[in-house]
Amino acid sequence: MATRTLIDTNILVYRYDRRFPDKQRIATEVLRDGIASGSARIAHQSIVEFVAATSRGGKEHRLLDTAAARREAEEFMVQFPILYPDTSVLRMALRGTAAYGLSWFDAHLWACAEVHGVAELLSEDFQHGRMYGTVLVRNPFLSVSPAT
């Protein structure tokens, strides 16, 4: 059985960001592999952040128009199990800000993985290879040069 993995918002966003073709390709592969293996999970928070990140700004700067962002969010909710916060996630996130010095949003995402028993968090926003509690963080974009 594949390791259960939590997908961070940045992977969802890069899937639609043509400005970074290498990251777009990797994000697409990560999501396809997650669907094929049934191992990937997405936090409620990441769906909310995805819609905001891809549809903000003027028309010329948006990755997706608002309707397309909503449609893609709906597709993610069909394709992946969505993990929702409860009081235990919120309490764990509060501890994560203190124990690991994480921002509130990063601590909340980590806490979602920790509480739901997800072993791996895929993100470029954490320290690659570090264990946060029982959750291992892996950055799938490490092979991409910083300029792309």
Question: For each predicted feature, which ranges?
Answer:
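Short, well-structured N-terminal submotif of metal-dependent ribonuclease cores
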Residues: M1-I42, K59-A67, V144-A147
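Acidic, PIN/NYN-like endoribonuclease modules and their adjacent C-terminal/linker elements
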Residues: A2, W110-T148
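Hydrophobic helix-cap positions at the C-terminus of alpha-helices
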Residues: D33-G34, F76, G96
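Aromatic- and histidine-enriched alpha-helix N-cap/loop-to-helix transition segments
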Residues: I42-V48
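Helix-adjacent hinge/juxtasegments
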Residues: T54-F80
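Active-site neighborhoods of divalent-metal-dependent phosphate/nucleic-acid chemistry enzymes
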Residues: Q79-L121
